[in-house]
Amino acid sequence: MMRRHLLNAGDLSRDDAIAIFDDADRFAHALVGREIKKLPTLRGRTVITMFYENSTRTRVSFEVAGKWMSANVINVSPAGSSVGKGESLRDTALTLRAAGADALIIRHPASGAAHLLADWTAAETGEDGPAVINAGDGTHEHPTQALLDALTIRQRLGSIEGRRILIVGDILHSRVARSNVVLLDTLGAEVVLVAPRTLLPIGVDGWPATVSCDFDAELPAADAVLMLRVQAERMNGGFFPSVREYSCLYGLTERRQALLPGHAVVLHPGPMLRGMEIASSVADSSQSAVLQQVSNGVHVRMAVLFHVLVGTQSAEEEGAA
């Protein structure tokens, strides 16, 4: 049973994930052909987004998801709030709870920030506070990204169980990689992490995945390839000799794309560094599901908001989609 919050991919059972996928598909279908994309599902609910890091896809898709479900969506940013005057995250959280927030969606540079938010908003009265959804906390996790990636794979390949999925690039700094490894393992996939040793975290051998430093060798047996951006903003040293050498060894070029099976799907959580980890021709090819991921991001986040705010019944049973 899915909890009130979504803080980690590990919060989700296989049944939880499948229910979210099914409801995401239902919401997508319910919106087809509507001149005005509005469902009454969350009418009267207040959803507040708190983005302390830059974001395009995640922030926009959460806002669109809430608005398409008729929620009141309010954005709180450091620059335009008392955070810019030095207010702590805890005081901001308690203020938003007192103002009547039903859900708080947070992206923060500190790992564990979403957990603290959930604890703080519940501790004052001992009652359930607002639902908290982790939209990315430091290098820790990004569970809704893992959900939309997995849904995209399911739509493209028909199933996830037994599929061999490569996650390639900056594993060390990637919350997307961490959440995907956990969720894909829960769903029965075989996950292979491909990266130079310098971009693999300590303890990676204990993850439910195998590790390889040879990209070319892994491609012929891959069903899906998830490419990751090198997160230079989180680096303070030399993790590889040069951009050119990194791209040569770990970039998804046309030559490497030709090594993939014809059915394989290429994914990227964005933003893409074209010409570094992925060639433009590959990103724009028929095997690429990058824009499908963006579309699925809205529908998955609609489903997540539905589950944390309405309950564990499906959207179909509730008549919400």
From Swiss-Prot:
One of its GO terms (cellular component) is cytosol. L-aspartate binds at residues 85, 175, 229. It catalyses: carbamoyl phosphate + L-aspartate = N-carbamoyl-L-aspartate + phosphate + H(+). Its EC number is 2.1.3.2. It is an enzyme of class 2 (transferase). It holds the Pfam family OTCace. Pathway: Pyrimidine metabolism; UMP biosynthesis via de novo pathway; (S)-dihydroorotate from bicarbonate: step 2/3. It comes from the Bacteria. Transmembrane segments: none annotated. InterPro entries: Asp/Orn_carbamoyltranf_P-bd, Asp/Orn_carbamoylTrfase, Asp/Orn_carbamoylTrfase_sf, Asp_carbamoyltransf, Asp_carbamoyltransf_Asp/Orn-bd. PROSITE patterns: CARBAMOYLTRANSFERASE. The keyword Transferase applies. One of its GO terms (biological process) is 'de novo' UMP biosynthetic process. Keywords: Pyrimidine biosynthesis, Transferase. GO terms for molecular function: amino acid binding; aspartate carbamoyltransferase activity. Carbamoyl phosphate binds at residues 57-58, 107, 142, 145, 270-271. Catalyzes the condensation of carbamoyl phosphate and aspartate to form carbamoyl aspartate and inorganic phosphate, the committed step in the de novo pyrimidine nucleotide biosynthesis pathway. Belongs to the aspartate/ornithine carbamoyltransferase superfamily. ATCase family. PANTHER family: ASPARTATE CARBAMOYLTRANSFERASE, ORNITHINE CARBAMOYLTRANSFERASE, MITOCHONDRIAL. Heterododecamer (2C3:3R2) of six catalytic PyrB chains organized as two trimers (C3), and six regulatory PyrI chains organized as three dimers (R2). This is Aspartate carbamoyltransferase catalytic subunit.
